[in-house]
């Protein structure tokens, strides 16, 4: 688990899942220039891109922010046991997100503020 300190504030990344995106790289990035993309294979493969399946490897995670006064959860990921057949990666998800949150030292009842960067289904669990 990664944690950064910014003054007296700590920021911890809480992983929900990391893996291949549901669509090919060109679908995720419609203006993708393949020649320019392939130049970056040395650092992208295998942790950020799967060339055999043409899938970007993406991460879904929350940020646990502790200010000393407040405990803030930024984005709540996709969430478990949701009907999302149009998004196979998130359909009926079953991951130990709450265990990871507790491992970082916060239970759901410890959160003072929940913030969502935007309201896509992978951010509002």
Task: List where the protein language model places each region.
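Conserved nucleotide-sugar donor-interacting segment of glycosyltransferase catalytic cores
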Residues: 125
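Metallo-beta-lactamase
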Residues: 1-103, 110-122
